[in-house]
Structures are given as structure tokens and as C-alpha cells.
Amino acid sequence: MLAHLNQVTRIPPCPPFSGREARLKFHFFSWSTFMLSWPNNATLREIRTRAATNLTHHPHLVDTLYHASPQTPFLTRSGALYRFVTCCNCTLPNISIQQCKAGDRPGDLEIILQSNGGGRPASFQFPSSPTGSLLRCIVAASLLPEVSVGHQELSPLRSRSQGGQTDVRSGPDPARRLVALLRREDGAPKDPPLGPFGHPRGPGPAKSEDEESERRDAPPPPLDSSFQASRLVPVGPGFRLLVFNTNRVINTKLVCSEPLVKMRVCNVPRLINNFVARKYVVKETAFTVSLFFTDGVGANLAINVNISGTYLSFLLAMTSLRCFLPVEAIYPAAVSNWNSTLDLHGLENQSLVRENRSGVFWTTNFPSVVSCRDGLNVSWFKAATATISRVHGQTLEQHLIREITPIVTHREAKISRIKNRLFTLLELRNRSQIQVLHKRFLEGLLDCASLLRLDPSCINRIASEGLFDFSKRSIAHSKNRHECALLGHRHSANVTKLVVNERKTRLDILGRNANFLTRCKHQVNLRQSPIFLTLLRHIRRRLGLGRASVKREITLLLAHLRKKTAPIHCRDAQV
């Protein structure tokens, strides 16, 4: 009865196939399953869509890419490879694609980007694993037809003629001669196509069958393509940031009932056309609506809605208006302004975003530095926090990449990849910006782990399991009066305070994103504990490697702190 347990059952890595078509379907299913496991990202969606479209229309290329040996490089001239590789490094887990010059160190699983200007090509080496091999094939499929395996081009038309269709050539065969005669009609003059009213239609750009079929098979854009509450933007090698939409300003018009207009809506005299007649603040859903006069007072009302959230929240807000306004109909709405905010997590010397910069100006009524490029203003605050208005979507992402890349790649910039990965992960999990209390606690954990020579990557693993998750609606983190009113609290600005030297100090007095060095630089007049100086010396050793200016700044700060604390220590010793 136990004899069958002595036999070892071996399961083959691939199931037995009955034909070539079944094998191609299995490979395409494996690639599709791998692509569907990717996170939600605009660039990853582009890679997934282009690869699936090319492989669906040309299934004979699946075998060519799948059976290519790891030592055979893929060659391409498409500039989209840089963008695809950067997105994969920043978004896909356990993926690190190395970039080097082609020919220096030939390796396995590489894609060589050839320069169109005759320069030296660049090589991108994928990880030596099944996942890296699969990712290389998918990236190559998304770059078709500008890809070749070794010296063999993968043009779809050429591969199609080699895969199953016979190449039509003129010869002694009567069938070939007939096909050649019929093909001559393609070059003959023809009448222009007629338009919808019988008039000749003007000449347009020629469209291939592949483009038309791709347009027909393209999936419809998602409903949230024009609005994203948070957007992940990869900037530079391995640096990520999350941009959050704080609020939007939406303009529209209302049609009100005639008998109740004078009584409930516009019971004030009209001064000018854009005069605010009435202003309402609603707590749930939280929004502010302002009523304006129009020419047809009593029939139409122009409203201005300031709201944060999705379009579903906006529809709920418009429904809430019917509770206190005699609304009969609402005209189509238009978004007039977008406001977004972001934090540069992992930038140790945060003063770099405001110092020694050209093309910026200071505002007098608000302590911020405004950088103006392409007609768009980005306001930078003290703790590497920025706000940007008027743009959203892909335009916002491209403008932020142009704005932040010079800061991240500056020769004096000191970037902590561990902090950037940790704080970005928490913001991505909780869909809100990390709060002051959480950031200080986690930054202290990371610095103490580095001081005690422990592995700080374990904190990232714990955070990925949800141990450090937070809620933006908790009382100690919220400054929104609507949320505090919903929770039954009296004060709207109930931010956590600390008692230092018999004085209350707010945690966010230097900004939500203020790190250890920023607090040391602006709060040196307070009495500090001995562990404070120990951590500061350790940070000087850690950040001073190759950064003379940062080390010099911390050394001056240490000398200033010793001078401040010296009389206190002497007095304590006498007592």
C-alpha cells in the first residue's frame, strides 16, 4: 500500500503541447499574467498595452523572443527605452536594471540602445532571473518594430512573410504574374473619397492596417484618467515622490425656482457682476460654495465650488446643495483650477531647494520661494514641501520631473534611498501625506538603527505589512475644521505639542516634512539631551562622506550647540 510513496513524481516546468498554437497561447498567457501583477502606473500601462497589442497582432514573434538566449542582446534605437527602464526600476519590486556603456562588460539579458547620432551605445542589463528574462522580453515587445535580436530584425512585416505567408515575387508562375498585375493598381490614379455630403474629402495621412486595428482594439480610458487623488512620479534613478491633489475649483451655473429666489437665494442688492452674494461651508462632504450674481438674477446663479476628492464627491456635493437652495437644474461644470502638493522624502539637506537657485523669487506675504518655468509657479517651503497649481495629469508629472530633477541630481544633494522608499510606501498605502508625528518617530527609528549598526531595511519590511499605517482623520493629525467638527472636537488646530523648557512647541512649526537636520538648524536655542548630540555626530559621519559642505555645516552646528550647552553642564556639576 505504501509502494507508490517510494516513487518520486516529477512535474515538468512546462506542460506538454499538442502543437505550435497551444505553445504560443501558453507563453502569451504567462506573459499576460506577469503584466497584470504590475501596480497601477501610467507608464506601466503603456508598456502593457503596447506589448499586448504587438504580440496579439504578431503571435509569431512570441517564439522568437521567448527562445532568444540570455547571451544574445536585443538592439533598439527607440528613445522610449529610457522612460520604460526608469519606471520599472521605481515601481516594480525586486527589479534593478543596471545601465552601463555597451562593450565595457558584456553580460546576460541586456538591451543595447544604439545612438542615432553615431555616439557610443548604452547597455541596460536586466536581473539574471526568470523575472528579469521575462521583463526583458516584454520591454522588447513594447518597442516593436524598432527591435532586433542580435543582427536579426524583428519587423512585423518581414516576420509575417517568414512565419507563414508566401512572399509574392514575379516569376514564371502564372499565379504570381496575376498577383503582380493586381498590385499595380495600387499605384494607379484614383478618385478621391466622397465626404458625408457628397463632396470630395481632402487627402489625409495614410493609415496602416495595424494602426486602424490597434485603434479599434484599444480599451476605453478609465473614468479616473482625468483625476487622481495621488500620483506616483519617478524622478531620477531610484527616487520617487507622491503628488497629492489637495483641492479643485469648479465653476458652474444653477437654475433656481422663481418664487423662492428673492426669499432664499439673492436677498441682497447687486453691486457688480462678480460680487459674492452668499457663501456656504458644508462639513460632509467637506466643500465651500460661493454664489455670484449673473445678468439674469432670479433665473441663473453662478457658483464656485472648492472641493477635494473624486468626482463622486462632487456629485454628492451638488446633491447636498438642494437641501438649502431651490435648485431645479445644474449646468455642465468646468474645472478652473487644480492645487497639488508634494514632499521630497529622503533629501537630507532640505535647504538645497531654496538656496543658491536662479530663476526664483520670494513672496512677501508668505515665506516661500516661487520657481517659475513655462508659465507655471511652484512654491517651495522650508521643509522641502512644494505646491503647484493650474495643471494636473501628465502635464503635472512632466513639469515636476523638469523641476525636481536638478535638485535631486545636484552635486551637493544627499539622498537617503531608505527614507524615500519608506515614506513613499506609507503614503502610497494610506493615500495621504505622512503626518508629523509619524515622520519623526520613523526617522528616529532609522537613525537609531544606523547608530547601533543594525539593518534598517527591516523597518521597510514591517511597514509593508501595515504596522506603521495611519489615518489622516485622527484628531492629533488633523487641522481641518470639518473633520474635527465631525469627530466632536472643539478646536480645529489641535496639532500635537511638546513641552520643552516649560514652553509648548508645535510639532509642525517648521513644516510637516522637516527632518532632523532642519530642526537642528532652526531650533538650536533649546536645551538638547545627550542622545541628540550623539545622533548629530553620527549623522555628520554618515552624511559627510563626499559632501564637504554638509559636513562643514553640521560641524558648525555642533560647535554652536556645545557653546550653548556648556554653561548648563557646569551649573549642573556645581549643584
Swiss-Prot record:
Keyword vocabulary terms for this entry: DNA-binding, Viral transcription
Give a GO biological-process term: viral transcription
- Specify one Pfam family: Herpes_UL87
Q: Where is the composition biased (Polar residues)?
A: 158-168
Ranges for region Disordered: 153-174, 186-228
MF annotations from Gene Ontology: DNA binding
Q: Which InterPro entries match?
A: Herpes_UL87_C
User: What's the stated role of this polypeptide?
Assistant: DNA-binding protein that is required for viral late gene expression. Selectively recognizes late promoters by binding to a non-canonical TATA box element (TATT). Part of the viral pre-initiation complex (vPIC) that is responsible for the expression of vPIC-dependent late genes. vPIC is composed of at least BcRF1 that binds the viral TATT box, BDLF3.5, BDLF4, BFRF2, BGLF3, BGLF4 and BVLF1.
| Family per record | Belongs to the herpesviridae UL87 family.
What is the protein name stated in its UniProt record? Late gene expression regulator BcRF1
Q: Which organism is it from?
A: Epstein-Barr virus (strain B95-8) (HHV-4)
